[in-house]
Amino acid sequence: MSFERFFSAEEILIWRKQELSKGGRAVDLDWLLDIGGGLGWSTLQELKIFQSSFHKLDLSLEELSLIWMRHLSDQIPLQHLVGKCPWRDFELKVNSSALIPRQETEILIDIALKKVDAGLMKYGRWADLGTGSGALAVALARALPLWEGHAADCCNDALALAESNINTLTENANVSLHLGDWWEPLKPWWGNFDLVVANPPYIPKTHLSELDPVVRDHEPILALSGGDDGMDSCRKVIKGAMKGLRSGGWLLLEHNFDQSEQALNLMVDSGFLEVDFENDLEGVRRFGLALRP
């Protein structure tokens, strides 16, 4: 089916009002116009001023309406319906095999690059445990092109998604992918990692039913559930890091909003030094960092 993809600002604004009358959040519909339709945020703000202007969309308004209605009726994430998600300075392919990358996780990369810069390390070896879509791995490969990278996940489909994103979004990246549980597939390199990042599942299983249906029913439970207290995977990552990291290597971990004390205590008890935390975009303790002695 072929649709016309040139629309006036007035047509787009009328369409937007009609679609919002069906339900949903304005911020989500604007996201769809931006990422699905190719109408940038700044252009969207200008429509009210320049209503006689014309704009070419990547998808027609009819096609965007079909996506919006499916999002509302089936509560499927818009990212899954359009098959992509912007993250940092690139756009990831996404599907139901892996968690949709969250904006707050970008901070983990910022922390990592600060630690690398502080150590003036041009060469090194990093690992991304539970890589999922490969968001962290792609970001590290792009920022540290001379480093050797390793991305691991226990889900074959997620690993295939990560491989696709790494191949598409990095140029000649030296990244190896491994199938297995956390540190286990990286045994041959234990004691030789300079940097390890992880965003493991950390939702207590008793809280899963409280999640938004868009998340609960369409993102993999394997990437959400952290066991009884939400810390099962965090424990494995932290305890394994003493074997996996070299002396002077950094562990950077994302955890739930109320798990900072537990995570930092685990790091201290495991023998790490310079144990500290960083806040997320809302000012909440979300990241634990520690140096292997």
From Swiss-Prot:
S-adenosyl-L-methionine binds at residues 130-134, 153, 182, 199. Pfam families: MTS (PF05175). Substrate binds at residues 199-202. Gene3D superfamilies: Vaccinia Virus protein VP39 (3.40.50.150). Methylates the class 1 translation termination release factors RF1/PrfA and RF2/PrfB on the glutamine residue of the universally conserved GGQ motif. This is Release factor glutamine methyltransferase. It catalyses: L-glutaminyl-[peptide chain release factor] + S-adenosyl-L-methionine = N(5)-methyl-L-glutaminyl-[peptide chain release factor] + S-adenosyl-L-homocysteine + H(+). Its EC number is 2.1.1.297. GO terms for molecular function: nucleic acid binding; protein-(glutamine-N5) methyltransferase activity; protein-glutamine N-methyltransferase activity. Belongs to the protein N5-glutamine methyltransferase family. PrmC subfamily. Keywords: Methyltransferase, S-adenosyl-L-methionine, Transferase. One of its GO terms (biological process) is methylation. The gene is prmC. It comes from Prochlorococcus marinus (strain SARG / CCMP1375 / SS120).
